């Protein structure tokens, strides 16, 4: 008997069991990433040239004389994805810029482009600047002056700056509306590469984009610029390709681990998305020093996907109750209580976290794995509540739904797990995160409501009534569109909380907070246009995966 058939047979006792099978599409990638052979000669050649270019770039980065020059240099280096080589230099430059005129009252630079760039970059690095700096571009009614309309680059920078807004910043709300309207109107009449930049920005704002995805895009755009810096460009291309080699090695490791588990055969009801899981981690951190962290996080995402599908797309209540209890006990001796198919994922789950403890023991950090275990137990408890609602046909009030569904968004778990492989993440950082700070709550909310919008139609088609959208419609007697608009409004509020949470002073380091910000960015990209890019990666994620993990940049 084939394994899949054997599984179905074993999961039936005296009576036919009706299971909520979701019928997920197979992996897009097959064995494509299972093996990767590093060309050491090419890698060594890249490293050698990069070291030379790095010194040249450092010198050029520090050579800016005017504020506009300094900001443009920082912006280009960051967009090209090579800023991680110059973190201290950039921090020192921005600290100097901020402290010279913290209220930005000097009128040396009154142009919209420079001020908008200054505002966005400093905010993204945690410096608070008042939106009042834009008042010089507004009329008595708070509207942006129509005389700005010919300054397309200025308006484009204003548009990008508007996405770092926090609560109560009406000027930035007006900036977003003004810049969006004028960019949409101007886009068809612009020449390349500016037309491409405007169209791209309207589709995906820089602040909410996955940095590595943005890097790949910007390298191609920057190459078209007449005033491009050839040293920067070559450095960026070589660095992208060298880092891509590391990413391919890591993906190969994750893919082989996934293949060895053989869930595709033994648990055919679940999604086969190991490649998409790894892509997710590249959004959290792409830099080379986070290699171990990426592999750990990718494996965790793949594992929680299996657990999620067990609750959501296969298990029945009596099985799930035992499964939930076994995970709370976290003891391999519990395995005999489980149905055969659950034994497979239960053992794999415990083995995975044992591996984490072994890996981290080398750095004396094995104790932090407990924080990730507790988050795993938490999400499983909430999955069980959700599964009971679905199976029993219960539709909770929206407040009850959200109190449970925030955990099942996975972001409490994934944020905690993202710190495991970060050697700079201390026990104090894990303790801070365990208390669910406001920025984490915002990120979890963002993930939940955007996921609910994107998956509503599919879940409705499967007979799922306990969805956030359905609960809101029932509670408030409104249409689907009104409910979706409300959830979108909640997402915008959450983004403002995230933006506020990275502003100084902060209780933890910028490196810790950046993981949370990047997880928010992944949601914006993965669920673009209300599509579930994880479950159905062919439209949304496939082009990004090809750009980052298949195609290298021509040197």
From Swiss-Prot:
**Which residues are Mg(2+) 3-binding?**
451, 455, 459
Coarsely, its chief localization is: cytoplasm
Protein's pathway: Secondary metabolite biosynthesis; terpenoid biosynthesis
Q: Which GO terms describe its molecular function?
A: magnesium ion binding; terpene synthase activity
Matching entries from SUPFAM superfamilies are given as: Terpenoid cyclases/Protein prenyltransferases, Terpenoid synthases
Q: Which InterPro entries match?
A: Isoprenoid_synthase_dom_sf (IPR008949), Terpene_cyclase-like_1_C (IPR034741), Terpene_cyclase_plant_C1 (IPR044814), Terpene_synth_N (IPR001906), Terpene_synth_N_sf (IPR036965), Terpene_synthase-like (IPR050148), Terpene_synthase_metal-bd (IPR005630), Terpenoid_cyclase/PrenylTrfase (IPR008930)
Question: What does the UniProt induction comment state?
Answer: Up-regulated by jasmonic acid treatment.
> Can you tell me which residues bind Mg(2+) 2?
308, 312
Tissue expression per record? Expressed in stem and leaf trichomes. Detected in roots, fruits and flowers.
Q: Where does Mg(2+) 1 bind?
A: 308, 312
Record's function text: Sesquiterpene synthase involved in the production of viridiflorene from (E,E)-farnesyl diphosphate (FPP). Has no activity with (Z,Z)-FPP. Can act with a low efficiency as a monoterpene synthase with geranyl diphosphate as substrate.
> What's written under domain?
The Asp-Asp-Xaa-Xaa-Asp/Glu (DDXXD/E) motif is important for the catalytic activity, presumably through binding to Mg(2+).
Q: What is this protein called?
A: Sesquiterpene synthase 31
Its organism's taxonomic lineage begins at: Eukaryota, Viridiplantae, Streptophyta, Embryophyta, Tracheophyta
